[in-house]
């Protein structure tokens, strides 16, 4: 934290983007679902790191905002499609294909999935989503995952941090 404070003291620095991936690490290592995640995040916050970081930034005159790149959802494995290298990206909630034929065949072979055309994606980028609260994991395996389009995965916080 001392080194960060020194780096932020340079008068030419007007904007700083700081990525703290601890919450993501906690989520990806989750064994006890969202309840366990909440407890681990609370324990981490009690370590003082977040308070020290916010105070350092505020003391240096920065406007501080807290956000996330995505949310998470508790899901249960519906099985992993056995496709070798067919999908371009193999996520827990979404698989993407470069071939319409492969995407269509995969959707037909996996009934608990759906396809949706999303504006802004390249024409040869075809996502196949796990439906409901399921994921492309071993059948019945519970996990906290992301990559789908549920409300919990899409809406993220954007909070201004201020002294009170």
Which residues does each predicted region cover?
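Feature captures the catalytic ectodomains and active-site-proximal regions of enzymes
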Residues: 1-164
């Amino acid at each position: 934290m001392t080194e960060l404070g020194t780096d932020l003291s340079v008068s030419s620095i007007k904007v700083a983007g700081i990525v703290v991936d601890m919450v993501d690490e906690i989520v990806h290592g989750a064994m006890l679902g969202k309840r366990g995640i909440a407890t681990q995040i609370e324990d981490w916050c009690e370590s003082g790191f977040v308070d020290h970081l916010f105070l350092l930034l505020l003391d240096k005159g920065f406007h501080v905002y807290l956000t996330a790149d995505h949310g998470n959802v508790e899901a249960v494995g519906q099985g992993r499609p056995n496709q070798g290298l067919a999908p371009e990206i193999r996520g827990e909630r979404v698989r993407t294909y470069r071939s319409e034929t492969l995407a269509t065949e995969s959707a037909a072979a996996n009934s608990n999935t759906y396809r949706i055309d999303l504006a802004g994606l390249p024409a040869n980028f075809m996502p196949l989503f796990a439906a409901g609260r399921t994921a492309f994991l071993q059948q019945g395996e519970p996990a906290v995952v992301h990559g789908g389009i549920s409300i919990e995965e899409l809406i993220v916080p954007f909070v201004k941090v201020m002294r009170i």
